[in-house]
Amino acid sequence: QWGDEGKGKIVDLLTDRVKYVVRYQGGRGAGHTLILNGEKTVLRLIPSGILRDNVTCLIGNGVVLSPAALMQEMSELENRGVNVRDRLLISEACPLILPYHVAMDHAREARWAKRPIRATGRGIGPAYEDKVARRGLRVGDLFDRAAFAEKLKNILDYYNFQLVNYYKVEPVDYQKTLDDVFAVADIITGMVADITTILDTARKNGDNILFEGAQGTMLDIDHGTYPYVTSSNTAGGVASGSGFGPRNLDYVLGIIKAY
């Protein structure tokens, strides 16, 4: 139960029956492989329901969101004729994964090569660290660019000090990071919505909602094979990662490897 159980495939099979598919934890490390009309698609951040025209996809506050990864995934889907922007909604409370998170991930794995955590190198762990430390930048910060630029400068000073002085690697460039984020900021903020309210309204309307986990149960930060785990709660993160009341969940489907 450390991944590759077929979660993405089962989600894809169930999406014909639902109106919403929700990602509530993890980052761009899901790696859900889907086959639709004979074409293979790998989704790492965007919910698997995006391939179904009848489904609205939601990214909840528990997901750490990489602007670069989101743009790449959107581009790949749109090039294949998938309507993403009108059917994907994002919580403003999603922490952002930025280049310094990725740099820190790689620096740590190199430093502790003899006993690595086997991180994906995508900055997911460091982004969750920033969230817990209450210093991270979030999607909602993109609405105020002046404030975002100031916050980015402060946090990048913090990261670059560690990268240069402890890990002995190159610092992350502030201006490039800022320019790259601002280049896609309008696209991201255009998809921001109140995910909790949408889910509550859907529940009251009797709409079917499917919550899509990104990792297996044994990778749960609290209940998995610590320390070789991910940085979030897997099944248990549904409520806190989306704002959906836990008592409103009426069915849980677990996917188990047969070998």
UniProtKB/Swiss-Prot annotation:
It catalyses: IMP + L-aspartate + GTP = N(6)-(1,2-dicarboxyethyl)-AMP + GDP + phosphate + 2 H(+). The keyword GTP-binding applies. Pathway: Purine metabolism; AMP biosynthesis via de novo pathway; AMP from IMP: step 1/2. Its main location: cytoplasm. This is Adenylosuccinate synthetase. One of its GO terms (molecular function) is adenylosuccinate synthase activity. InterPro entries: Adenylosuccin_syn_GTP-bd, Adenylosuccin_syn_Lys_AS, Adenylosuccinate_synth_dom1, Adenylosuccinate_synth_dom2, Adenylosuccinate_synthetase, P-loop_NTPase. GTP binds at G3, D4, E5, G6, K7, G8, K9, G31, H32, T33. Belongs to the adenylosuccinate synthetase family. Keywords: Cytoplasm, GTP-binding, Ligase, Magnesium, Metal-binding, Nucleotide-binding, Purine biosynthesis.
